[in-house]
């Protein structure tokens, strides 16, 4: 049996499978490997949602938890906002937040350290309420049969400070309704995307009340602007708890009432994730809360946590503290805010490999100061670590290349007698001490590491807006002049030339086409990823050439 041909066909078949999987995702079909498809993040039509989702008329303001007795009726998300709603804009060194006096909700968040696109002088807009995006952070107070201040209630701003001048910036809003006075205090620190949010709830009535505070993110189901159709990244809801750990939920599952997540917890967080960025509500640790994911309207979803405050006697005040992360997926900073928050950077089943790679990459960047050269250095280190395996692989391939003429002679000698041909081939392999799979197995061991590195480079917000040299001004977008993809195609052709030529003409043609197929795909991939593959291929070529030349010289000496 020609084992090489079988292995090559297996590789080719698997490549076709991957291409088909990407085609399925691109066309809104379920992924073959269980990943979410764009259909799960795409806007749903009103007809489909009305027919399949009974929750499409769910109010934007939650009902009180069952523990507080009968739920109250509250205004829905379509309730008109007061005409005199005021916008309050506050600015720190990293954030510009726009609050609406309606509910003291955050209706726009601009990340001042991140440009909207490569070369843009406009900041990245994460939260917004506009024609192209609905994505807001909201809070409020609810109670059984009561009309407490919610995110649809007019609030008055009671502070004058609008720009950060020291280390902290505080903005405060106040409203009174249903016998409760609610004061919302937002505290922002210099250099931080973590907003501390405090609710002080005072019973100004004559009877005891049982209020609950809710923390809510409201978002449409659309993919972020500029999402690539050539590689998939997750956009949806994430829930974390110590009990169930990190859980991702697609908007499609929420719309179909198929969402699986922890409902009751006293730890963790709830948020919405997209490529490079995230928002998350983090209630105080040890505080019991009810998590709720639901569809408010067609293509409008809410992720919320509800905390019961217990009985509040007349004249008494109770407080609730939480944190709101609104910013980049900065793993180190997020881990300092809450356990598990850094897991929004999700490497899947390769996390055990990817996290050490990211740590090493971060350390290298602290030395080199440039993410492009960091990728080069990291690739060199990985190739050095795997050099013994690569050496064994290349030596095996070099010896296979040397016996290729003898192998062809055996094929001509035995013709269609496959049994005798296989026996003769096995005898030749034993005589020459060649393992036909010796060139493949060492490479298979390295595959998980290289896939993990692929995900690290794809998911790391550090790549966004990071320049390398000359024409590469942003490693997170494609090469504007397609130089790196062209170099990658050239290195793939060189690798094929260094390998033994497949005896089957069809296989040989397939191998020559592969650089065109994969190189063509790289024209649309981030430059950082293509840089990694270019460096990896170049080092592989140098290793293979050096080892092959060494074996050729040794063979010539034995002569």
Curated annotation (Swiss-Prot):
Biased composition (Low complexity): 42-80
InterPro entries: Membr_insert_YidC (IPR019998), Membr_insert_YidC_N (IPR028053), YidC/ALB3/OXA1/COX18 (IPR001708), YidC/Oxa/ALB_C (IPR028055), YidC_ALB_C (IPR047196), YidC_periplasmic_sf (IPR038221)
Region (Disordered): 34-80
Keywords: Cell inner membrane, Cell membrane, Chaperone, Membrane, Protein transport, Transmembrane, Transmembrane helix, Transport
Localisation: Cell inner membrane
Recorded superkingdom: Bacteria
Record membrane topology: Multi-pass membrane protein
Record GO terms (molecular function): membrane insertase activity
Main location: membrane
Pfam families found in the cross-reference section: 60KD_IMP, YidC_periplas
GO biological process, one term: protein transport
Keyword Cell inner membrane: yes
GO cellular component, one term: plasma membrane
Transmembrane segments: 6-26, 367-387, 441-461, 480-500, 510-530
Functional description taken from the UniProt entry: Required for the insertion and/or proper folding and/or complex formation of integral membrane proteins into the membrane. Involved in integration of membrane proteins that insert both dependently and independently of the Sec translocase complex, as well as at least some lipoproteins. Aids folding of multispanning membrane proteins.
Self-association state and partner proteins as the record states: Interacts with the Sec translocase complex via SecD. Specifically interacts with transmembrane segments of nascent integral membrane proteins during membrane integration.
UniProt family annotation: Belongs to the OXA1/ALB3/YidC family. Type 1 subfamily.
Name the UniProt record assigns to this protein: Membrane protein insertase YidC
Organism, scientific name: Bordetella avium (strain 197N)
Gene: yidC
């Amino acid at each position: 049996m020609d084992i090489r041909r079988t292995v090559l066909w297996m590789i080719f078949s698997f490549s076709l499978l991957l291409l088909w999987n990407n085609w399925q995702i691109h066309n809104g079909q379920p992924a073959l490997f269980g990943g979410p498809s764009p259909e799960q993040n795409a806007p749903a039509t009103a007809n489909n949602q009305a027919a399949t989702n009974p929750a499409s008329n769910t109010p934007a303001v939650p009902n009180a938890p069952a523990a507080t007795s009968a739920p109250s009726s509250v205004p829905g998300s379509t309730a008109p906002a007061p005409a005199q709603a005021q916008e309050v804009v506050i600015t720190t060194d990293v954030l510009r937040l726009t609050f609406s006096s309606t509910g003291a909700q955050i209706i726009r968040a601009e990340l001042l350290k991140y440009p909207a696109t490569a070369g843009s002088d406009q900041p990245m807009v994460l939260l917004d309420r506009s024609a192209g995006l609905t994505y807001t952070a909201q809070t409020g107070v609810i109670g059984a049969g009561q009309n407490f201040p919610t995110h649809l209630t007019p609030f008055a701003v009671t502070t004058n400070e609008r720009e950060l001048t020291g280390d902290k910036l505080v903005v405060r809003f106040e409203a009174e309704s249903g016998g409760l006075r609610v004061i919302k205090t937002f505290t922002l620190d210099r250099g931080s995307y973590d907003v501390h949010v405090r609710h002080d709830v005072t019973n100004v009535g004559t009877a005891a009340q049982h209020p609950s505070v809710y923390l809510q993110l409201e978002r449409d189901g659309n993919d972020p602007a500029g999402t690539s159709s050539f590689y998939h990244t997750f956009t949806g809801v994430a829930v974390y708890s110590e009990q169930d750990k990190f859980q991702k939920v697609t908007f499609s599952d929420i719309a179909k009432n198929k969402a699986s997540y922890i409902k009751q917890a006293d730890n963790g967080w709830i948020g919405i994730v997209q490529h490079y960025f995230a928002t998350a509500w983090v209630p105080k640790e040890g505080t019991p809360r009810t998590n709720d994911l639901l569809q408010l309207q067609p293509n409008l979803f809410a992720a919320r946590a509800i905390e019961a405050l217990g009985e509040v006697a007349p004249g008494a005040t109770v407080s609730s503290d939480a944190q709101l992360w609104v910013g980049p997926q900065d793993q180190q900073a997020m881990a300092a805010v809450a356990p598990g928050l850094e897991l929004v950077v999700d490497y899947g089943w390769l996390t055990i490999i990817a996290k050490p790679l990211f740590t090493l990459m971060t350390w290298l960047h602290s030395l080199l100061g440039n993410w492009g050269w960091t990728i080069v250095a990291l690739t060199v280190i990985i190739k050095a670590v795997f050099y013994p395996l690569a050496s064994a692989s290349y030596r095996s391939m070099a010896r296979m290349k040397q016996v290729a003429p003898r192998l062809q002679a055996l094929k001509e000698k035995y013709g269609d007698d496959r049994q005798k041909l296989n026996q003769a081939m096995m005898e030749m392999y034993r005589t020459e001490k060649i393992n036909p799979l010796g060139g493949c197995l060492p490479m298979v061991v390295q595959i998980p590491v290289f896939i993990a590195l692929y995900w690290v480079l794809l998911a790391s917000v550090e790549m966004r807006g990071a320049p390398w040299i000359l024409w590469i001004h942003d490693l997170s977008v494609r090469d504007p002049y397609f130089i790196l993809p062209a170099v990658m195609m050239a290195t793939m052709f060189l690798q094929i030339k260094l390998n033994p030529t497949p005896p089957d003409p069809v296989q040989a043609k397939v191998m020559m086409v592969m650089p065109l197929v994969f190189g063509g795909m790289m024209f649309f991939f981030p430059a950082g990823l293509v840089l990694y593959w270019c460096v990896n291929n170049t080092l592989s070529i140098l290793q293979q050439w050096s080892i092959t030349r060494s074996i050729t010289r040794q063979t010539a000496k034995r002569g």
